[in-house]
Amino acid sequence: MTSVPPELAARAATALLAAVRLLPVAIASPFLGGPLVPPVVRVALAAGLGAVVATLRPAALPPDALTLAAGGARELALGIVLAFLVSAPVEAARAAGRLADTLRGATLAELHVAPIRQRESAAGDLLAQWVVVLAAWAGADRLVVAGLLGTFASAVPGAAFPAAAALGVSLRAASDLVASAFLIAAPAAGGVLAADLALALVARVAPQLGAVNAAQPARAALGLLALGAGAATAGGRLVQLVALAGRGVALVAGGAP
Protein backbone atom coordinates (compact mmCIF):
# COMPACT_ATOMS: atom_id res chain seq x y z
CA MET A 1 0.00 0.00 0.00
CA THR A 2 1.51 3.30 -1.10
CA SER A 3 1.63 6.22 1.31
CA VAL A 4 0.71 9.80 0.46
CA PRO A 5 3.74 11.92 -0.51
CA PRO A 6 4.63 14.37 2.28
CA GLU A 7 4.39 17.39 -0.02
CA LEU A 8 0.90 16.40 -1.18
CA ALA A 9 -0.22 15.82 2.42
CA ALA A 10 1.14 19.22 3.46
CA ARG A 11 -0.63 20.99 0.60
CA ALA A 12 -3.87 19.14 1.34
CA ALA A 13 -3.68 20.28 4.98
CA THR A 14 -3.04 23.87 3.87
CA ALA A 15 -5.99 23.72 1.46
CA LEU A 16 -8.24 22.39 4.22
CA LEU A 17 -7.23 25.12 6.68
CA ALA A 18 -7.66 27.83 4.04
CA ALA A 19 -11.10 26.49 3.14
CA VAL A 20 -12.13 26.51 6.81
CA ARG A 21 -11.17 30.19 7.02
CA LEU A 22 -13.20 31.11 3.93
CA LEU A 23 -16.24 28.92 4.61
CA PRO A 24 -17.95 31.25 7.18
CA VAL A 25 -17.54 34.16 4.77
CA ALA A 26 -19.02 32.15 1.90
CA ILE A 27 -21.96 31.20 4.13
CA ALA A 28 -22.72 34.68 5.48
CA SER A 29 -21.54 37.29 2.99
CA PRO A 30 -23.26 37.97 -0.36
CA PHE A 31 -19.89 39.11 -1.74
CA LEU A 32 -18.56 35.54 -1.59
CA GLY A 33 -21.68 33.43 -1.91
CA GLY A 34 -24.21 34.25 0.78
CA PRO A 35 -27.33 32.55 2.12
CA LEU A 36 -29.14 32.54 -1.24
CA VAL A 37 -26.43 30.42 -2.90
CA PRO A 38 -26.90 26.63 -2.55
CA PRO A 39 -24.79 25.17 0.29
CA VAL A 40 -22.93 22.83 -2.05
CA VAL A 41 -21.80 25.80 -4.15
CA ARG A 42 -20.60 27.71 -1.08
CA VAL A 43 -18.59 24.74 0.18
CA ALA A 44 -17.17 24.14 -3.30
CA LEU A 45 -16.19 27.82 -3.60
CA ALA A 46 -14.37 27.76 -0.25
CA ALA A 47 -12.67 24.47 -1.10
CA GLY A 48 -11.62 25.70 -4.54
CA LEU A 49 -10.13 28.92 -3.20
CA GLY A 50 -8.42 26.92 -0.46
CA ALA A 51 -6.84 24.68 -3.08
CA VAL A 52 -5.59 27.73 -4.98
CA VAL A 53 -4.06 29.12 -1.79
CA ALA A 54 -2.35 25.77 -1.12
CA THR A 55 -0.77 25.73 -4.57
CA LEU A 56 0.58 29.26 -4.11
CA ARG A 57 2.05 28.64 -0.66
CA PRO A 58 5.54 27.10 -0.36
CA ALA A 59 5.58 23.44 0.57
CA ALA A 60 6.01 22.59 4.26
CA LEU A 61 6.06 19.53 6.47
CA PRO A 62 2.63 17.87 6.88
CA PRO A 63 1.14 18.57 10.35
CA ASP A 64 0.05 15.83 12.71
CA ALA A 65 -3.63 15.31 13.56
CA LEU A 66 -3.57 17.36 16.78
CA THR A 67 -1.82 20.31 15.13
CA LEU A 68 -4.26 20.15 12.22
CA ALA A 69 -7.27 20.15 14.56
CA ALA A 70 -5.93 23.11 16.56
CA GLY A 71 -5.18 24.99 13.36
CA GLY A 72 -8.68 24.25 12.09
CA ALA A 73 -10.21 25.70 15.26
CA ARG A 74 -8.13 28.87 14.91
CA GLU A 75 -9.02 29.21 11.24
CA LEU A 76 -12.72 28.76 12.02
CA ALA A 77 -12.57 31.49 14.67
CA LEU A 78 -10.78 33.82 12.27
CA GLY A 79 -13.27 33.00 9.53
CA ILE A 80 -16.21 33.89 11.78
CA VAL A 81 -14.64 37.26 12.57
CA LEU A 82 -13.98 37.92 8.88
CA ALA A 83 -17.55 36.93 8.00
CA PHE A 84 -18.90 39.41 10.56
CA LEU A 85 -16.72 42.22 9.22
CA VAL A 86 -17.66 41.59 5.59
CA SER A 87 -21.38 41.19 6.36
CA ALA A 88 -21.68 44.22 8.68
CA PRO A 89 -22.61 46.83 6.00
CA VAL A 90 -25.31 44.59 4.52
CA GLU A 91 -26.66 43.77 7.97
CA ALA A 92 -26.70 47.51 8.80
CA ALA A 93 -28.98 48.14 5.82
CA ARG A 94 -31.15 45.15 6.73
CA ALA A 95 -31.46 46.32 10.35
CA ALA A 96 -32.36 49.84 9.20
CA GLY A 97 -35.13 48.50 6.97
CA ARG A 98 -36.53 46.29 9.71
CA LEU A 99 -36.44 49.15 12.21
CA ALA A 100 -38.19 51.47 9.76
CA ASP A 101 -40.87 48.84 9.06
CA THR A 102 -41.42 48.44 12.79
CA LEU A 103 -41.82 52.20 13.24
CA ARG A 104 -44.22 52.36 10.31
CA GLY A 105 -46.34 49.60 11.80
CA ALA A 106 -45.48 47.21 8.97
CA THR A 107 -44.19 44.38 11.15
CA LEU A 108 -46.76 41.99 9.68
CA ALA A 109 -45.65 42.75 6.12
CA GLU A 110 -42.76 40.30 6.14
CA LEU A 111 -41.60 38.15 3.28
CA HIS A 112 -40.87 34.45 3.58
CA VAL A 113 -37.55 33.88 1.81
CA ALA A 114 -37.85 30.21 0.93
CA PRO A 115 -34.20 29.47 -0.03
CA ILE A 116 -32.94 30.47 3.43
CA ARG A 117 -36.12 29.48 5.31
CA GLN A 118 -36.56 32.69 7.22
CA ARG A 119 -38.89 35.66 7.32
CA GLU A 120 -37.49 38.97 6.18
CA SER A 121 -38.73 42.54 6.45
CA ALA A 122 -39.67 43.92 3.03
CA ALA A 123 -37.72 47.15 3.49
CA GLY A 124 -34.83 45.29 5.13
CA ASP A 125 -34.46 42.87 2.23
CA LEU A 126 -34.75 45.72 -0.29
CA LEU A 127 -32.04 47.80 1.41
CA ALA A 128 -29.73 44.79 1.80
CA GLN A 129 -29.97 44.00 -1.93
CA TRP A 130 -29.51 47.70 -2.70
CA VAL A 131 -26.24 47.83 -0.76
CA VAL A 132 -24.93 44.77 -2.60
CA VAL A 133 -25.73 46.37 -5.97
CA LEU A 134 -24.19 49.70 -4.96
CA ALA A 135 -21.03 47.99 -3.70
CA ALA A 136 -20.72 45.98 -6.92
CA TRP A 137 -21.21 49.12 -9.02
CA ALA A 138 -18.58 51.04 -7.03
CA GLY A 139 -16.09 48.15 -7.00
CA ALA A 140 -16.11 47.82 -3.21
CA ASP A 141 -16.96 44.12 -3.44
CA ARG A 142 -13.70 43.48 -5.28
CA LEU A 143 -11.80 45.21 -2.49
CA VAL A 144 -13.48 42.85 -0.02
CA VAL A 145 -12.55 39.73 -2.00
CA ALA A 146 -8.99 41.00 -2.46
CA GLY A 147 -8.75 41.71 1.26
CA LEU A 148 -10.00 38.23 2.13
CA LEU A 149 -7.51 36.50 -0.14
CA GLY A 150 -4.78 38.85 1.04
CA THR A 151 -5.17 37.57 4.59
CA PHE A 152 -3.30 34.43 3.56
CA ALA A 153 -0.20 36.52 2.87
CA SER A 154 -0.16 38.10 6.34
CA ALA A 155 -1.56 35.15 8.31
CA VAL A 156 -0.66 31.74 6.92
CA PRO A 157 -3.22 28.95 7.36
CA GLY A 158 -2.97 27.54 10.87
CA ALA A 159 -1.26 30.62 12.34
CA ALA A 160 -2.08 31.96 15.80
CA PHE A 161 -5.44 33.71 16.17
CA PRO A 162 -4.98 37.52 16.47
CA ALA A 163 -7.43 38.00 19.34
CA ALA A 164 -6.57 41.62 20.19
CA ALA A 165 -6.80 42.84 16.60
CA ALA A 166 -10.00 40.86 16.00
CA LEU A 167 -11.65 42.34 19.09
CA GLY A 168 -10.75 45.93 18.20
CA VAL A 169 -11.83 45.74 14.57
CA SER A 170 -15.02 43.82 15.43
CA LEU A 171 -16.08 46.41 18.02
CA ARG A 172 -15.54 49.19 15.51
CA ALA A 173 -17.55 47.31 12.87
CA ALA A 174 -20.37 46.73 15.36
CA SER A 175 -20.50 50.42 16.25
CA ASP A 176 -20.55 51.35 12.55
CA LEU A 177 -23.37 48.85 11.99
CA VAL A 178 -25.56 50.36 14.72
CA ALA A 179 -24.77 53.95 13.74
CA SER A 180 -25.52 53.34 10.06
CA ALA A 181 -28.77 51.55 10.84
CA PHE A 182 -30.00 54.45 12.97
CA LEU A 183 -28.80 56.98 10.39
CA ILE A 184 -30.98 55.36 7.72
CA ALA A 185 -33.98 54.68 9.95
CA ALA A 186 -34.00 58.07 11.75
CA PRO A 187 -35.76 60.00 8.93
CA ALA A 188 -38.45 57.31 8.80
CA ALA A 189 -38.91 57.61 12.56
CA GLY A 190 -39.18 61.40 12.27
CA GLY A 191 -41.68 61.18 9.42
CA VAL A 192 -43.87 58.68 11.23
CA LEU A 193 -43.74 60.72 14.44
CA ALA A 194 -44.71 63.90 12.57
CA ALA A 195 -47.61 62.08 10.91
CA ASP A 196 -48.78 60.68 14.24
CA LEU A 197 -48.69 64.13 15.83
CA ALA A 198 -50.65 65.62 12.92
CA LEU A 199 -53.25 62.84 13.07
CA ALA A 200 -53.58 63.22 16.83
CA LEU A 201 -54.14 66.96 16.42
CA VAL A 202 -56.78 66.44 13.72
CA ALA A 203 -58.51 63.76 15.79
CA ARG A 204 -58.66 66.12 18.76
CA VAL A 205 -59.87 69.16 16.81
CA ALA A 206 -62.30 67.36 14.51
CA PRO A 207 -62.95 63.82 15.76
CA GLN A 208 -65.97 63.42 13.48
CA LEU A 209 -63.72 63.28 10.40
CA GLY A 210 -62.25 59.89 11.33
CA ALA A 211 -58.89 60.97 9.98
CA VAL A 212 -56.86 58.49 12.03
CA ASN A 213 -58.03 55.39 10.19
CA ALA A 214 -58.33 57.07 6.80
CA ALA A 215 -54.81 58.47 6.89
CA GLN A 216 -52.98 55.25 7.81
CA PRO A 217 -51.87 54.55 4.20
CA ALA A 218 -50.52 58.09 3.93
CA ARG A 219 -48.71 57.61 7.24
CA ALA A 220 -47.05 54.42 5.99
CA ALA A 221 -46.16 56.07 2.67
CA LEU A 222 -44.61 59.03 4.47
CA GLY A 223 -42.46 56.67 6.53
CA LEU A 224 -41.38 54.84 3.38
CA LEU A 225 -40.54 58.12 1.64
CA ALA A 226 -38.46 59.24 4.61
CA LEU A 227 -36.72 55.85 4.62
CA GLY A 228 -35.81 56.32 0.96
CA ALA A 229 -34.40 59.76 1.73
CA GLY A 230 -32.31 58.36 4.57
CA ALA A 231 -31.06 55.49 2.42
CA ALA A 232 -30.09 57.88 -0.39
CA THR A 233 -28.20 60.04 2.09
CA ALA A 234 -26.39 57.12 3.73
CA GLY A 235 -25.75 55.10 0.55
CA GLY A 236 -22.23 56.44 0.14
CA ARG A 237 -21.48 55.69 3.78
CA LEU A 238 -22.59 52.07 3.40
CA VAL A 239 -20.48 51.59 0.27
CA GLN A 240 -17.56 53.10 2.16
CA LEU A 241 -18.15 50.58 4.95
CA VAL A 242 -18.04 47.75 2.41
CA ALA A 243 -14.71 49.04 1.11
CA LEU A 244 -13.42 49.49 4.66
CA ALA A 245 -14.39 45.88 5.41
CA GLY A 246 -11.67 44.82 2.97
CA ARG A 247 -9.21 46.90 4.97
CA GLY A 248 -10.60 45.55 8.24
CA VAL A 249 -10.00 41.92 7.35
CA ALA A 250 -6.42 42.80 6.42
CA LEU A 251 -5.94 44.50 9.79
CA VAL A 252 -7.28 41.46 11.64
CA ALA A 253 -5.08 39.02 9.76
CA GLY A 254 -2.09 41.32 10.10
CA GLY A 255 -2.54 41.43 13.87
CA ALA A 256 -2.67 45.22 14.10
CA PRO A 257 -5.89 46.90 15.25
Write out the residue ranges for each language-model feature.
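Hydrophobic alpha-helical segments and their helix-loop boundaries in membrane
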Residues: M1-P257
